[in-house]
Amino acid sequence: MSWSILEFLRKNPEELKNNLKRRAIDVSLVDKAVELDKKWRQVLQEVERLRHQHNVLSSQIPKLSGEERKKKIEESKNLLKILEDKEKELEKIEVERDRLLSSLPNLVADDVPNGPDDSYNIPIKFWGKFKVYEGDVEEFLRQTKDANVNYEIIKWKPKGHAEMLEDVLHLGNTLKAAEIAGSRFYYLFNDIVWLDFALLLFAIDYITQQGYTLVLPPYMLRGEVIQSVIDLDTFKDAIYKIENEDLYLIATAEHSVAAMFFKEEIEKDKLPLKFAGISPAFRKEAGAANKDLKGIFRVHQFHKVEQFIFSTPEDSWKYHAELITNAESIFQQLELPYRIVNIASGDLGACAAKKFDLEVWMPAQAKFREMVSCSNCTDWQAFRMKIRYVDRKNNKRGYVHTLNSTAIASTRTITAILENYQREDGVVEVPKVLRKYLEIFPKAPKDYIYPLKNKII
């Protein structure tokens, strides 16, 4: 089984063009790729013909003697030189073709909504009881139109997570962090740090109970590897590079876990392989200059637990459903109300064929905010990383499918807890499911997080 994009290129280039149109990408790239592939196949035929000629000639030489033998040896040398030149030409064309094809985004799944940006994303599910300030009811109903949602109206306006963190609880300081490190960094203290750790422990406890192998991966990857996992040309402003080193800081454990089988083959009967990666995540957020400047929703570093699956092509959609189900279970246990959104074609990102986002309702902001991103990357990453499965019983090889989903991104989930679990007096209730991870530590909060009288710094 060959790479899906290459198959489309050969069998149905017009369909490949339609796919690019759904992402608003220049379709002339397909025409260039078709020409390169046609040229590659022509040169391949020449190479195979020359190889056959050389093999025939080589088999004749041992049977000859004298001048005729010398003549054939010379002829063989000349033919070998021509063959080597043709093989180099073939390799050059193949590299050029594959580089062009690798620059293309993944094929979009049929049931992905068409549209150039996130305004075309379609909510497909709502869960939980939504806490809505009386002045925001109209806006809430606009965002949940045509959905049968359960909500309660509250008469007091919840405070935003940034205000709660710094001015009410006095358990965070982004101003001092900005002074010594720049914007989008933070200091967190005491109960919020315990909350961060409890979220991570809860997520890895739950996900590993679903049969996932826990992994602590490298926090940096070489350029060749990160380029294979993501579209680095597009995301170069989002990824940190180590100065004077061929190393990049990962933006999620997905990157390192995906590369675990870089340039390797996996026995088909070992699939699926399921992992839960835990790591810090480092992001420049260069494209979000004026978004979420306050608080800890959009930051340069945070802790994250990531689900990742290597699958056979025929099973990948089943596992995509499993990943989002796991994520939903985590947020249901946290009792954070959310919606699931089917992401539009123009908002997908190059890697994904289809993506669901889980967005939690933030009552202070009166909007849904992304907490989880769940993608089926089909064979897009696997082709670039040269990760194949081997079916020895049927003598077949093919590219694996890779899938990923957030389990928990700690700081974002903390913002959701601060907005959804706050009381009017500023006290924040600790979600019940997290309490068993805190009770073993004498200094950790148990049931509630109380405001400090004075700031720590």
UniProtKB/Swiss-Prot annotation:
Enzyme Commission numbers on file: 6.1.1.11
Which residues are listed as membrane-spanning? none
Q: Which residues bind ATP?
A: 283-285, 299, 370-373
| CC annotations in GO | cytoplasm
Biological process GO terms, please? selenocysteine biosynthetic process; seryl-tRNA aminoacylation
**Pfam families cross-referenced by the UniProt entry:** Seryl_tRNA_N, tRNA-synt_2b
| MF terms in GO | ATP binding; serine-tRNA ligase activity
Q: What is its EC class? A: ligase
Pathway listed for it?
Answer: Aminoacyl-tRNA biosynthesis; selenocysteinyl-tRNA(Sec) biosynthesis; L-seryl-tRNA(Sec) from L-serine and tRNA(Sec): step 1/1
- Predominant location: cytoplasm
Q: What are the record keywords, sorted?
A: Aminoacyl-tRNA synthetase, ATP-binding, Cytoplasm, Ligase, Nucleotide-binding, Protein biosynthesis
InterPro entries, per the entry: aa-tRNA-synt_IIb, aa-tRNA-synth_II, aa-tRNA-synth_II/BPL/LPL, Ser-tRNA-ligase_type_1, Ser-tRNA-synth_1_N, SerRS_1_N_sf, SerRS_core, tRNA-bd_arm
Q: Which reaction does it catalyse?
A: tRNA(Ser) + L-serine + ATP = L-seryl-tRNA(Ser) + AMP + diphosphate + H(+); tRNA(Sec) + L-serine + ATP = L-seryl-tRNA(Sec) + AMP + diphosphate + H(+)
Family per similarity comment? Belongs to the class-II aminoacyl-tRNA synthetase family. Type-1 seryl-tRNA synthetase subfamily.
- Protein name per the record: Serine--tRNA ligase
Which species?
Answer: Saccharolobus islandicus (strain M.14.25 / Kamchatka #1) (Sulfolobus islandicus)
